C-alpha cells in the first residue's frame, strides 16, 4: 500500500491540509479525520479484531472491526471499503452511518495520542475474511450483546474509541438494530 496521510482539520472540522499518517500520530497529534466501522456477518455477529503488535497506537488491544483515515479527495465510504479490503480482505455491503458526529481524544500507554473526528459506520461482510497479519493479529465473530458485556466488564482490554462508541446509547441502539436485521 502506498504511503497514507491523514486529513488535518481546523477548529470547525474543515480540512486544512494533510500529514503523513505516522508523522501525525505523536504525543501532540493534530485533529484529523478518521472513521470507525463495525462489521456484521449474515448471522448478525460482530467482527471484533485485535490490533497487531506492530501498530503505533494501542498495539495488541481488541477493537471494533476496522478503523482508518480517508485520504485527500476520498470519501469516508470509499476509505472504509479500501481498508476493509486491505486489513481484512473482505468485501462489504449496506454501509450505514450509526454515529456520524463521533469525535474523541485519547492517549495510549506509550503516550501516543489519537485526536480524531471519527464518523462511525456499520456494514455487512459479504465474503470470507483474509486477514492481513500486519494489521490484525486475531479476530472473533461474537454476538453484539456479549461484546457489550465484555466492554462493560473489561474496558481496558479494548480500544478507547470502541468503548466510547458503544457507550453512546443512541449509537449502541443503532448497532443493535443493524445486527438484528
Swiss-Prot record:
Metabolic or biological pathway, per its Swiss-Prot or TrEMBL entry: Isoprenoid biosynthesis; dimethylallyl diphosphate biosynthesis; dimethylallyl diphosphate from isopentenyl diphosphate: step 1/1
Cofactor: Mg(2+); Mn(2+)
Subcellular locations according to the entry: Cytoplasm
UniProt-annotated binding residues for Mn(2+): 25, 32, 69, 114, 116
Cofactor note as given: Binds 1 Mg(2+) ion per subunit. The magnesium ion binds only when substrate is bound.
Catalytic activity entry: isopentenyl diphosphate = dimethylallyl diphosphate
Its EC number(s): 5.3.3.2
Positions of the Nudix hydrolase domain: 30-164
Keyword Cytoplasm: yes
Domain of life: Bacteria
Pfam families: NUDIX
One cellular component term from this protein's GO annotations in UniProt: cytoplasm
An annotated GO BP: isoprenoid biosynthetic process
Enzyme class: isomerase
Annotated keywords: Cytoplasm, Isomerase, Isoprene biosynthesis, Magnesium, Manganese, Metal-binding
Keyword Transmembrane helix recorded: no
GO molecular function, one term: metal ion binding
Annotated residues for binding of Mg(2+): 87
PROSITE patterns tied to this protein: NUDIX
Active site: 67, 116
UniProt subunit comment: Homodimer.
Family under the similarity heading: Belongs to the IPP isomerase type 1 family.
Primary role: Catalyzes the 1,3-allylic rearrangement of the homoallylic substrate isopentenyl (IPP) to its highly electrophilic allylic isomer, dimethylallyl diphosphate (DMAPP).
Name of the protein this chain belongs to: Isopentenyl-diphosphate Delta-isomerase
Organism: Salmonella paratyphi B (strain ATCC BAA-1250 / SPB7)
Source organism phylogeny: Bacteria, Pseudomonadati, Pseudomonadota, Gammaproteobacteria, Enterobacterales
Amino acid at each position: 500500500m502506498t504511503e497514507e496521510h491523514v486529513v488535518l482539520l481546523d477548529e470547525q472540522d474543515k480540512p486544512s491540509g494533510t500529514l503523513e499518517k505516522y508523522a501525525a500520530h505523536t504525543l501532540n497529534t493534530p485533529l484529523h479525520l478518521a472513521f470507525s466501522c463495525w462489521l456484521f456477518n449474515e448471522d448478525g455477529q460482530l467482527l471484533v479484531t485485535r490490533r497487531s503488535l506492530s501498530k503505533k497506537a494501542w498495539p495488541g488491544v481488541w477493537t471494533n472491526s476496522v478503523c482508518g483515515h480517508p485520504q485527500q479527495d476520498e470519501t469516508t465510504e470509499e476509505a472504509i471499503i479500501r481498508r476493509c479490503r486491505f486489513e481484512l480482505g473482505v468485501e462489504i455491503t449496506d454501509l450505514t452511518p450509526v454515529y456520524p458526529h463521533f469525535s474523541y481524544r485519547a492517549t495510549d500507554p506509550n503516550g501516543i495520542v489519537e485526536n480524531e473526528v471519527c464518523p462511525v459506520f456499520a456494514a455487512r461482510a459479504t465474503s470470507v475474511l483474509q486477514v492481513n497479519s500486519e494489521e490484525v493479529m486475531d479476530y472473533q465473530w461474537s454476538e453484539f450483546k456479549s461484546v457489550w458485556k465484555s466492554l462493560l466488564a473489561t474496558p481496558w482490554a479494548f480500544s478507547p474509541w470502541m468503548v466510547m462508541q458503544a457507550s453512546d446509547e443512541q449509537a449502541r441502539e443503532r448497532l443493535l438494530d443493524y445486527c438484528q436485521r
